[in-house]
């Protein structure tokens, strides 16, 4: 597989990982706090894989609206780049630059390159209309809503959810917890994974969040009112 990691601001604070395997499998993640990977993020990008007798190659298209970024200076943008190739049979990893996510400093060690400033906008509406039919009572129940995403440029993204369908994402892993503290569950809902890294902060050797978005939309512990976030 190959990994393409990009720090769009070049400041070592937030990076984005794009992974493509030889079997056309993909993965992506947000990188914060030097080496913390949040795989709940699903970015908008494209890829293609080609294989022949000489080997295999991959092509990746990452639109400029994929991630938020600061305004460029003097028409030039500084990017942080990290590229590597992993051979599964031997576990060998060839990387440029020489950096490792196992070290204390990883994201800030990306290679800095200068590219011209580009502007690319995005406006997307994802509607939904699920239905439910009760065979016992003979009743039907329908809902409707939409996710709206507007990015006129890299500095101003607007995300909205109208009657969000929180059942459209993958189910959580089953965890049996007999302790007093609740089990931490990451958020996979698209509305909350967009720019989620802005709520992360480092406290000693722990990664914490200012807002626990999984409680949004849920009831409080006593069943009265909304849950604390």
Walk through the language-model features, giving the residues of each:
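Structural preference for beta-rich elements and adjacent junctions enriched in aromatics
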Residues: 1-229
């Amino acid at each position: 597989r190959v990994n393409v990691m990009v720090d769009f601001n070049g400041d070592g604070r937030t990076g984005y990982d794009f992974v493509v395997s030889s079997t056309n499998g993909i993965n992506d993640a947000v990188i914060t706090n030097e080496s913390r990977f949040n795989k709940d993020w699903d970015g908008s990008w494209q890829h293609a894989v080609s294989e022949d007798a000489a080997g295999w190659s991959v092509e990746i298209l990452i639109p400029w609206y994929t991630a938020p970024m600061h305004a460029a200076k003097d028409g030039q943008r500084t990017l942080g780049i990290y590229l590597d190739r992993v051979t599964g049979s031997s576990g060998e990893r060839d990387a440029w630059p020489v950096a490792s996510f196992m070290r204390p400093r990883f994201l800030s060690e990306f290679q800095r390159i200068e590219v011209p400033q580009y502007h690319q906008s995005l406006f997307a509406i994802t509607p939904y209309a699920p239905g439910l039919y009760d065979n016992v009572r003979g009743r039907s129940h329908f809902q409707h809503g939409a996710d709206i995403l507007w990015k006129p440029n890299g500095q101003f993204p607007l995300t909205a959810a109208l009657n969000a369908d929180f059942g459209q994402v993958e189910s959580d892993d089953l965890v049996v917890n007999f302790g007093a503290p609740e089990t931490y569950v990451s958020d996979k809902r698209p509305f909350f994974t967009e720019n989620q890294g802005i709520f992360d902060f480092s406290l000693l050797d722990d990664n914490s969040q200012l807002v626990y978005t999984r409680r949004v939309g849920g009831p409080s512990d006593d069943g009265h009112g909304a849950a604390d976030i």
